[in-house]
Amino acid sequence: MAYSLPTFPQALPCSSTKTSSSLATFRSPFLRFNGSTSLIPSSISITSRGTSSPTIIPRAAASESDSNEALANTTFHGLCYVLKDNIDTDQIIPAGAACTFPSNQQERDEIAAHALSGLPDFHKTRFIEPGENRSKYSIIIGGENFGCGSSREHAPVCLGAAGAKAIVAESYARIFFRNSVATGEVFPLESEVRVCEECKTGDTVTIELSDSGGLLTNHTTGKNYKLKSIGDAGPVIDAGGIFAYARMMGMIPSLA
């Protein structure tokens, strides 16, 4: 099932505390959004790329000239890191490492160093080596209920800062999925089968997205796996997050 994001009002006063009634209903297999539900985490601020302030461009984001049509040609290639079911946000980033939200590259590097550092000891292969802040694994493969637990938006942010571009899982916790879209850090993609049982950490994989879905190719095993369409969430992530998308579409004023 394709995901549909709500439409935005043309402008909202900064002092307004009312939720716009013009928001359309969002439906997915995991969550339902309506006019009283916000997709925008209150602590996230994405600066305009035209300002002199430090600009954070999420790793899943494409260039500003890309459009909805360009999403159909989005491809990710790299090594995969395989997990199983119920990977919670404490495993993705421990609470002690999520005290502040990164506002510059140095802080992104600091938070990236903690990506998936809360995994149990039986995970012998580390997502990031000690002392590093970039992972060699650009694609994460999981099972059911990926990103469950607390609502911290630091979870997708630290994965994107560490170099992850996409996650392929059977299902997602609704807040993690929403935060992934809102921040534009990683593509939360759904598999049609249990890919986490078919792939191993270190396999070389390619993800190709299209309007109707996507395809994950495991070059190590030679097998292909269909992915479900991410729908209207795709262009938002591709733009760099919900604020960047809204500015690009003229839904809210530019900071320039």
Swiss-Prot record:
The keyword Plastid applies. Expressed in vascular bundles of roots, cotyledons and rosette leaves. Expressed in stem vascular bundles which branche off into lateral inflorescences. Expressed in connective tissues in anthers. In young seedlings, expressed in cotyledon epidermal cells and vasculare bundles. In hypocotyls, expressed in parenchyma cells surrounding the vasculature and further peripheral cells. In seedling roots, expressed in cells along the vasculature. In roots of adult plants, expressed in cells closely associated with the stele. GO terms for cellular component: chloroplast stroma; plastid. One of its GO terms (biological process) is glucosinolate biosynthetic process. It holds the Pfam family Aconitase_C. Disruption phenotype: No visible phenotype under normal growth conditions. It is found in: Plastid, Chloroplast stroma; Plastid. Its EC number is 4.2.1.33, 4.2.1.170. Residues 1-59 form a transit peptide. The keyword Kinase does not apply. Pathway: Amino-acid biosynthesis; L-leucine biosynthesis; L-leucine from 3-methyl-2-oxobutanoate: step 2/4. Heterodimer of the large LEUC/IIL1 subunit and the small LEUD (SSU1, SSU2 or SSU3) subunits. Belongs to the LeuD family. PANTHER family: 3-ISOPROPYLMALATE DEHYDRATASE SMALL SUBUNIT 2 (PTHR43345:SF7), 3-ISOPROPYLMALATE DEHYDRATASE SMALL SUBUNIT 2-RELATED-RELATED (PTHR43345). This is 3-isopropylmalate dehydratase small subunit 2. It comes from Arabidopsis thaliana.
